[in-house]
């Protein structure tokens, strides 16, 4: 089989919901293994937590506040020695909505 010019494909996935993220990772792993490529990962990266503090009432009662948080879960995986068939299969792959994908060749 012919290999792509680079030694690996690095895929970084981000999502607010870790269950959707894990489903997307499983689809990528199955696709890559079916085309004969080996995989390193998925490696869970640290979760970014953004916290927002808001007053509960508009004008009075400064001591009464509410906190909200937004968690961004991330995974990193490398596809080692990808073939052209692997690249084509990853390009045609349909991932769940809400998953941000960064691919570096």
Swiss-Prot record:
Name the domain of life this protein comes from: Bacteria
Which chain positions lie within coiled-coil regions?
Answer: none
Q: Which Gene3D superfamilies match?
A: Ribosomal protein S10 domain
Stored InterPro entries: Ribosomal_uS10 (IPR001848), Ribosomal_uS10_CS (IPR018268), Ribosomal_uS10_dom (IPR027486), Ribosomal_uS10_dom_sf (IPR036838)
Which GO molecular-function terms appear in the entry? structural constituent of ribosome; tRNA binding
| Gene Ontology BP, a term | translation
Which Pfam families does the UniProt record give?
Answer: Ribosomal_S10
Q: Which GO terms describe its cellular component?
A: ribonucleoprotein complex; ribosome
SUPFAM superfamilies xrefs: Ribosomal protein S10
Sorted UniProt keywords: Ribonucleoprotein, Ribosomal protein
Please explain the role this protein plays, according to its UniProt record: Involved in the binding of tRNA to the ribosomes.
Indicate the family of this protein. Answer: Belongs to the universal ribosomal protein uS10 family.
Q: How does it assemble?
A: Part of the 30S ribosomal subunit.
Q: Which PANTHER family match?
A: 30S RIBOSOMAL PROTEIN S10 FAMILY MEMBER (PTHR11700)
Protein name (Swiss-Prot/TrEMBL): Small ribosomal subunit protein uS10
Q: What organism does this protein naturally occur in? A: Lawsonia intracellularis (strain PHE/MN1-00)
Q: Which gene encodes it?
A: rpsJ
